[in-house]
């Protein structure tokens, strides 16, 4: 009797072993297939010289690298994909071999919403590739997008190059220093995080102050290091805006007589563009940080506390050229109320909400005191 039971147990063990072996082999096979065929949605971009493109999807197979691209411009304007555009990964170039929805070398005119979608097909990238660059080197101002991440591990809140001590600041608005009613020489040392040679064509530095209004300061960036420095006379606390390649990278406050290090996150622009497509994600990342200013705590709020307005809450969505004075005033009030409601609905600190509302109020004042039809 026991002998029969032992034989039966051996049969059961063999069947169990065979089942486990088949399951393991299947898992290995599936893993091998998936390792050579990957899909990355909305990959993060380390640095870019354009705000006309967002990569909606990257598909990596053994035969091709397929990019689903969103292209932007004003309605009835166009963009052009160069036939010489290529990818760069691990110091090797991968050529364009096909396209859908766009013909390389010819204008692609924008629809009424200014948002187009097309597909670019390149030679296959290596399986071990963790990032790649998207380069049009032949055109003078051709697209250059660097460090396109394929791992999903890029730290959007703390980019490479950001000093450790700037990664945490208070969220309490009571820590804000008073307005500085003084004057003196201010120096701002600029560090472009994620910089690659060729990704920055120009940088300007608009500064707003109570006594001088707005003035713009040109910044010369060292092409080898991505750093620069500006010195200027300042009257009272100012609000400054780093503008790289015509795109704003946030704002920060500075006081006269300060020497401040400014860290600009070049990944900011492309990531905020993704906000239009992935509203379920928190893409309200920061554009810049400061070190050495009395306003550091205010300038360096956590990335999740920076409130980015969706396109539906931009001032242009509320006003029209043909409005009467009363209609125009009412539209500005509606704009301010809508922004306040949006700010209060966010899970952000008190600073972020107050700054968001103050920015909206300031926008209303600007439009009330200037003829926006001339803009």
What are the functions of these language-model segments?
Residues 149-350:
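A non-transmembrane, solvent-exposed segment enriched in polar/low-complexity residues
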Residues 356-375:
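Extended amphipathic alpha-helical segments with heptad-repeat/coiled-coil character used for oligomerization
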Residues 33-161:
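Conserved functional micro-motifs across diverse proteins
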Residues 138, 246, 362-366:
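Short, flexible beta-strand-to-coil junctions
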